[in-house]
Amino acid sequence: MATGSRTSLLLAFGLLCLPWLQEGSAFPTIPLSRLFDNAMLRAHRLHQLAFDTYQEFEEAYIPKEQKYSFLQNPQTSLCFSESIPTPSNREETQQKSNLELLRISLLLIQSWLEPVQFLRSVFANSLVYGASDSNVYDLLKDLEEGIQTLMGRLEDGSPRTGQIFKQTYSKFDTNSHNDDALLKNYGLLYCFRKDMDKVETFLRIVQCRSVEGSCGF
């Protein structure tokens, strides 16, 4: 076959395939159920890591009497996420729209992107499987992207992007031999566990409302 004819055939084939390639890479081709499944897997993993690491740290470093005084003191047990308007009970949660719950979940996830790095020494010494600051950070970033995608799908079919939420947790000494640092680490782990529980709960409610047959799982 002549070189010119072969080039023409290749060009024609490329033009025919172009619309298929564009459609195949388009956002709406991913089933909504799969998007929710992926988000829920990450949310559950983060919640489990947060719970296990918190429990492990508490048993290793925090005496019972110190735990009770910490939890009963509003100043030490106050989480930064308290500044993010979130429903405080089941009734309030059910009154929120899907987009409102996703937006709250996104803010909670973004509020931990930097603070989770302060817990580097805690994760490094943890025996909990998968508990490393890099792994937790990657899960947070993946879930952030997943929630933004879900928000875009529920709005107009386009991925939702936005600026990262700025948190105000202050940096502090994470030396494990410093009692003050121990309590601050304990406080961060307490808040991290609490916030990841909220995120998983809110995402499960939105999934139940949006995907048929997904309630109760």
UniProtKB/Swiss-Prot annotation:
The UniProt record lists the keyword Metal-binding: yes
Impact after mutating T53I: In IGHD1B; reduced ability to activate the JAK/STAT pathway
Matches recorded under CDD domains: somatotropin_like
Broad class of the protein's primary localization: secreted
List of residues that carry Phosphoserine: S132, S176
Phenotypic consequence of T3A: Found in patients with isolated growth hormone deficiency
Keywords: Disease variant, Disulfide bond, Dwarfism, Hormone, Metal-binding, Pharmaceutical, Phosphoprotein, Secreted, Signal, Zinc
Positions of post-translational Deamidated asparagine modification: N178
Deamidated glutamine PTM positions: Q163
Residues annotated as signal peptide: 1-26
Cystine connections: C79-C191, C208-C215
Gene3D superfamilies, per the entry: 1.20.1250.10
Impact when changing C79S: In short stature; idiopathic autosomal; affects binding affinity of GH for GHR and the potency of GH to activate the JAK2/STAT5 signaling pathway
Impact noted for substituting S134R: In IGHD1B; reduced ability to activate the JAK/STAT pathway
Pfam family, one: Hormone_1
Sites where the protein binds Zn(2+): H44, E200
Misc. comment: Circulating GH shows a great heterogeneity due to alternative splicing, differential post-translational modifications of monomeric forms, oligomerization, optional binding to 2 different GH-binding proteins, and potentially proteolytic processing.
Pathological association: Growth hormone deficiency, isolated, 1A: An autosomal recessive, severe deficiency of growth hormone leading to dwarfism. Patients often develop antibodies to administered growth hormone. Growth hormone deficiency, isolated, 1B: An autosomal recessive deficiency of growth hormone leading to short stature. Patients have low but detectable levels of growth hormone, significantly retarded bone age, and a positive response and immunologic tolerance to growth hormone therapy.
Family that this chain belongs to: Belongs to the somatotropin/prolactin family.
Subunit structure, interactors included: Monomer, dimer, trimer, tetramer and pentamer, disulfide-linked or non-covalently associated, in homomeric and heteromeric combinations. Can also form a complex either with GHBP or with the alpha2-macroglobulin complex.
Protein name: Somatotropin
